[in-house]
Amino acid sequence: MDFSQTQFHTIVGGQVGFAVPLIVAVTGHRDLVAEEIPAIRERVSKFLTDLRDEYPDRGVSVMSALAEGADQLVATEALRLGIPLIAPLPMERKLYIRDFETIKVQENFEFLSSRAAETYELPVTPGNTIESISEYGDARDQQYAQLGVFLCAHCHILLALWDGKDNDKLGGTGQVVRFHHDDVMPGYTPEATGSGLILADDESDLVYHIVCSRDRPDGQPAEGLEVGDYSWFSLDKDEPRSKTLPESHRRVFRFTSEFSKDAIRYSDKISDDAWPLMTKEDHAVLPVGLRDIDHVFRAADWLAIHYQKGMMFALKSTHFLAMLMGLMYIAYSDMLPMRIFLYAFLGFFVLATAIHTIGNRRSWHRKYLDYRTLAEGLRVQLYWAAAGVNSGSKTKYTHDTFLQTQDPDLGWIRNVMRVAGTECDASDYSAQAGLDFTLREWLGDADSGQLGYFRRKGEELERRHRRTEQMAKIVLWVGFAAISLFVLMSADLGELVRDPVVVLMGVMLLFVGVRQSYSFSIADAELIKQYEFMFRIFS
């Protein structure tokens, strides 16, 4: 199938192609001190350049609301460096532009927004209306609070041009930084809200803080901070501020970059062979943002299948070679003690070790599991978005609730999902067409969708598991019959058939043992239970 059009026209995180960019969101003060701007600009440029150089396989995109001051400064530097710009606006453009006090700032906003790769207008917050947010006051401030939450939820690094002071201004820089760390924004989040992640290691808390002052009375930085200072600022208990990227985040970024590198390497095959969740007919009636999720899903799904083939090759090969090693041992010890059998044994051992080593170095098993997990997370994310399902919280998105209790290293999967779902999360979609699509394609019936998939796979695994058990029973009874005949035979006849019977039993037991080991390695019994459970859920 030729889906090349999807590859070249789908923009994910401000970029085309299958790589998932590193997203830097901007929060900062509007009233920067003019004398400090050159140094701040230089530091921002150095920061973005270093990131781009360190992660060439995925690239960097900047997310900025293009407000006066810090937002426009960073956006300008990003464009100068050739870094894609994403512009989420807190409200409709015609309402937002009223917050720009001078013609020069408005013109700069218009210029920057015209150069943005993607621009979103966030929906009206729950309980408010277009009329209420048109007036200055709490309702309008709620839009800025929503913007701050959106930036935090859809970036990998929050770039804060900040004086370091906490304040009570709803949606202000101090509150956005606090929300990024603690998931708390007084006046917007419920009082009981805390970190949504059960794990101690939260990959979404990373702030790059550039200290600045403000052009107002008492505008100096917080005590202990100096203008021009910069640091990585996270929830690390031992070293919350550091000059180098914390290792836990570096590890997450490394896995995401590895996915992007693989996606780029196999981009042509993904374009030609990967199977999408949406057809061209679906594109015409469903939100455009779903294409982003589908685009990343195709890469993750194809790569999962690709590395599954490598993993299964290694698994089957090593088990087959183990069986051959056993046969060589039996042949040498019970048939003909020829050295060629020993050489063959060693050769099979070396070959099995080489295959196992190559599989480990290329991470076939880990990548298969990780990419399959990512693909299934994206599948759920797409169908939830199409059906208009949300997490039940105005401060949480689908990716925030995924894999909360799993290995912290899987945080990179949320990193990918937060980029793929950005455009969908920027809209408030709820239509019957999306719900019908989800029920038809995801739920399906006995022959289609997830219902049909789990039924078919469950039956397939059940048949394979049954064959393994039947084989073990056959060998058991054949062995019992052979030993019984051996006991009942005369001494002379028994001596004649003793060696062939022993060899036959050894070979049969070896074959069954390898078969059961293979079945255990691919977890047939456990998968049968899981597929039966999922089939009942979708039923």
Where are these regions (language model features)?
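Membrane-interfacial terminal anchoring regions of lipid-handling membrane enzymes
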Residues: Q175, D183-M185, G194-P276
